[in-house]
Design a protein with these regions (language model features):
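Residue-level signal for well-ordered alpha-helical positions
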Residues: 85, 182-185, 313, 336
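Short, basic/glycine-rich phosphate-binding loops at helix/coil junctions
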Residues: 82, 175, 310
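Accessory C-terminal segments flanking Radical SAM cores
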Residues: 2-10, 15-19, 63-68, 248-252, ...
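Conserved alpha-helical substructure of the radical SAM core
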Residues: 7-166, 192, 255-266, 363, ...
């Protein structure tokens, strides 16, 4: 037998069948799995929600899998197109720590398994953020964090490494000049501070042999479109596990229509060039022709305790607010008529103002369930 081949035996009905698989074939299959399946952005993991999606189409409300929690409505950066600017909330900007226990109890009642801390504002600006995260972790919630990274040092870095499943830091640029143009941060929360903090988190992760996934995020715009490869190199050299690109929307610096295709093509080419380092996303915006109906697979809670169907509520707060979990039992909010009314009143033209993964989720699950395009009764 050629030394490039390996014999694999597979018993069927007591008979050993000999199958020859070349190392090159195994490597190709392994590479495919790593490239296509084994990453946090594999969009087809929505298929695990098949039975819940069927319940929604049957006018039944499932329990959500994940909660997005906003600990803060304030931020120490001033980024273009940020929802924090649009909301412009001045009072009760932090989640009350005394209400956090009630929040966790409500999530547990709904059998929620994971919490993503994001914003809103910058979640780590909450004076008790580390304590809130530790409490949630001790109550066996899986945790994720979306952050600008400006406060990820010392004890908070340890808490993230010890208790979180993933963290994604919005870096946006590979040098201080472009970063400052996009983020407008105070000097003490600027580019070099963020990079130092990111390096500290990764160093602690490696020393502790933590399974934490550390990612970098880039909003692609006119200011950074010529520096795509350099920001990939930055994330890779620091030790990030991946970098994700998304288009900046609804801002003066958003890509012009004639720029989108070229930049998206560049990102696709760099995905191949830098493999196996994971380069995700692109520069094209998502749109949907179908009204959003899958929002109940998650919920969003703001610092006031108000519950919304998704994170893109900043310009339609009144029409999408479902209730307040600090004032009402969560079961009356989640399974109540107001929740159903909010879903009925969602408009696709509003949803298309933002780049949203639910565009894909809604379409795929509709085709699978209503149109049976996957022929699920066949393997």
């Amino acid at each position: 037998m050629d030394n490039k081949e390996k014999l694999m035996e597979r018993p069927i009905n007591g008979v050993a069948l000999r199958k020859v698989t070349t190392f090159s074939q195994k490597t190709e299959a392994s590479n495919f799995a790593q490239r296509v399946l084994v990453n946090p952005f594999e969009r087809n993991k929505i298929l695990r929600m098949y039975h819940d999606a069927k319940r929604i189409l049957e006018a039944k409300m499932p329990c959500p899998l994940m909660a997005v929690v906003y600990p803060s409505y304030v931020c120490n950066h001033n980024c273009q197109g940020c929802s924090c600017q649009e909301l412009d909330i001045k009072e009760n900007v932090f989640l009350d720590p005394q209400n956090f226990a009630k929040l966790l109890n409500s999530l547990r009642y709904l059998k929620i398994k994971s919490i993503e801390f994001s914003g809103g504002g910058e979640p780590t600006l909450h004076p008790k953020f580390g304590e809130l995260a530790e409490r949630a972790a001790n109550e066996e919630f899986e945790l994720g964090l979306l952050t600008n990274g400006s406060l990820l040092s010392d004890r908070l870095a340890d808490q993230v490494v010890d208790h979180f499943t993933f963290i994604r830091v919005n870096i946006d640029a590979s040098d201080m000049q472009i970063y400052n143009k996009m983020h407008c941060p105070p000097e003490k929360y600027g580019f070099q501070v963020v990079m130092n903090n990111l390096e500290e988190v990764i160093s602690k992760k490696n020393k502790k042999n933590s399974k934490l996934t550390v990612g970098a995020k880039v909003l692609v715009c006119q200011s950074n479109m010529n520096f795509i490869e350099s920001v990939i190199n930055l994330a890779k050299d620091i030790g990030c596990d991946y970098i994700q690109f998304k288009p900046m929307r609804n801002a003066k610096d958003s890509l012009l229509p004639e720029q989108v295709g070229e930049v998206d093509g560049l990102i696709r080419a760099l995905q191949e060039k830098y493999y196996p380092f994971l380069v995700c996303g692109g520069a094209k915006s998502s749109k949907s022709n179908r009204k959003c109906w899958l929002s109940p697979i998650h919920l969003v809670v703001d610092p006031l305790g108000d519950i919304y169907p998704c994170c893109h509520y900043q310009f339609r707060r009144e029409s999408t607010r479902m209730g307040n979990l600090f004032d009402q039992p969560i079961e009356k909010i989640w399974f109540g008529e107001r929740h159903k009314e909010v879903i009925r009143n969602l408009r696709v033209e509003d949803c298309n103002l933002y780049d949203c993964r639910w565009h894909y989720y809604n379409e795929v699950m509709w085709q699978i369930i209503e149109e049976d395009k996957m022929h699920l009764n066949f393997i």
